[in-house]
Regions:
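Conserved nucleotide-sugar donor-interacting segment of glycosyltransferase catalytic cores
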Residues: 138-202
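A short, glycine/small-residue-rich beta-strand->loop->alpha-helix junction that serves as a flexible
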Residues: 13-24, 308-312
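Donor nucleotide-activated moiety binding/catalytic core segment of transferases
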Residues: 135-150, 307, 319, 343-389
Length: 496
């Protein structure tokens, strides 16, 4: 057994189904190399069955079922409401976060925060949960996780949910999330599970020499696959098939006494809302890059809602519609705002939303099927909360208006974070379109940033979550080395 790093004495894993075989293999290596105490948290009996079947005796030191944020919040509260609220405020003060911010991260009980997704399917959780139930559940969750961290002396947590991520931050316990780098098939180990950041990246970039080749933008393969699947759902026949499949599944769940989660009618309405809203979009005068030729423009990349990268990683950000309105208001004369919808968001938006966008005289609604990378190349600047377009713009030296305080590229000189005070957005736009950003330096810095990000990443190869044999040994070794290296230059202290 090798010398045991402090951060690997006792490791907790919050079960992530898509990475289950990969993380199981990783836990085996940690146990073999360091004798790490392994504590696993699953969110259903199905998770328990997985480890009972695939984990050998002695690998896992403890395993237990715990609830996701919205699970159990439907239990009626019958106690002293004043005491309940006082305890909630005490916990908020201790951890420096409001319960409402945590609620945002759940697509069920936090659906009210997704202002541009009123047509997202409703669920049993969203409809049967009241505010007191949320307070009761969160009070219990914070007590549970603080007890777990202390009693099991956890040194690191992998894939934390939001509440354990907040507790880990407060107790000084490092966390790691496997996060897509957005370069080819690369992934990296993100820090700070509360917001999923990578603070060491700036120091890594400082060691990347100048003179890196310009970045050639390319769409990663999974995006193309997902895009084809989304477009296939825009047909009426597919809507009928999806509805039939859902009805059978819903009936089987009811017959066996299981919860079906989403409401039957709400899901059916969503399936048929997809082709209906797609046709609503296609009937509008959609812009092309040829229409924008010769006109400087800001590219606003819309994102789907609800979405983890918005509500979890950027809870401080305003709703997308507020930023769109603000930028359209503050643009200099002659500059347009080009808005491109995320293909997954179609069917969720309010009725008439796209038609209303065309009422802005300085806004161009782009064809959603336009390749995003082409729009990034042509734009004068990119405005986004957390979309891939922000990374692409940063890599090729385009000015980026970052609307998230937690984006990995925020430290770059050609990235601007608007001041929240009046005039903040206007000042940023004036900087960009008055030529105050050194575009040659921006392109050089962007290429170095790209190289640094690739340097802390690894390729997971042909891994398929349903095929344990698809995990290649050399890929596992690469991933584990990257995991261990992430602690060497990280900012978090190890628990004593």
């Amino acid at each position: 057994m090798s010398g045991q790093p402090k951060v690997l004495r006792s490791v907790a894993l919050c079960h992530s189904p898509q990475w289950r075989f990969l993380t199981l293999a990783m836990l085996r290596e940690l146990k073999r190399k360091y004798g790490t105490a392994v504590h696993v948290y699953v969110f259903s009996d199905q998770g328990l069955k997985f480890y009972a079947k695939h984990a050998e005796p002695g690998l896992i030191d403890s395993i237990q079922v715990c609830a996701l944020i919205s699970d159990g919040a439907q239990r009626p509260f019958t106690g002293d409401r004043g005491a309940l609220e006082a305890e909630a405020r005490r916990i908020e003060q201790r951890y420096g976060v409001t319960y409402n911010e945590i609620m945002m991260t759940d697509r069920h009980i936090g659906r009210g925060f997704s202002l541009l997704a009123p047509n997202f399917p409703r669920s049993l959780q969203s409809e049967a949960t009241d505010y007191s139930g949320v307070l009761q559940k969160f009070n219990a969750d914070f007590a549970f996780w603080e007890s777990e961290f202390r009693e099991k002396r956890l040194d690191t947590m992998i894939f934390p949910q939001k509440i354990p991520g907040v507790v880990a931050r407060t107790l000084g316990v490092p966390t790691r999330n496997l996060s897509r780098t957005r370069i080819g098939n690369l992934f990296h180990w993100a820090e700070n599970g509360e917001f999923i950041e990578l603070p060491r990246l700036q120091a890594v970039m400082a060691n990347v020499p100048r003179g890196q080749p310009p970045v050639e933008l390319a769409t990663y393969s999974q995006y193309d696959t997902n895009r084809k699947i989304a477009i296939a759902n825009f047909g009426w026949l597919r809507a009928l098939r999806n509805s039939a499949d859902w009805t059978v599944k819903f009936a089987m769940h009811r017959a066996t006494g299981r919860s079906s989660g989403y409401q039957w009618w709400s899901s059916i309405r969503h399936y048929f809302g997809l082709p209906a809203q797609w046709r609503e979009v296609r009937r509008l005068p959609l812009g092309t890059l040829a229409d924008l030729q010769g006109s400087p423009f800001v590219f606003f990349a819309m994102q789907e809602e609800p979405e983890m990268s918005l509500s979890w990683q950027s809870p401080e950000s305003w709703p997308q519609i507020a930023y769109l309105w603000q930028i359209a208001r503050d643009l200099p004369a002659g500059v347009k705002l080009a808005v491109k919808e995320h293909i997954y968001a179609i069917g969720r938006r309010p009725h008439g939303f796209y038609r209303h966008l065309t009422d802005f005289k300085n806004v161009v609604l782009l064809d959603p099927l336009l390749p995003g990378a082409d729009v990034v190349r042509a734009a004068g600047a990119i405005a986004t909360i957390t979309s891939t377009a922000g990374f692409e713009g940063a890599w090729i030296g385009k000015p980026v208006i970052s609307l998230s305080r937690h984006s990995l590229y925020n430290f770059l000189d050609h990235v601007r974070l608007p001041d929240l005070e009046p005039g903040g957005m206007r000042a940023v736009l004036d900087d960009i379109f008055s030529g105050r950003i050194d575009l040659a330096k921006a392109a050089e810095d962007g290429a170095r940033f790209h190289r640094a990000l690739a340097g802390v990443s690894f390729d997971i190869g042909s891994y398929n979550m349903n095929k344990p044999s698809s995990l290649e040994p050399e890929r596992l070794d690469e991933m584990l080395k990257s995991f261990e290296a992430s602690f060497e230059s990280a900012s978090e202290p190890a628990r004593e």
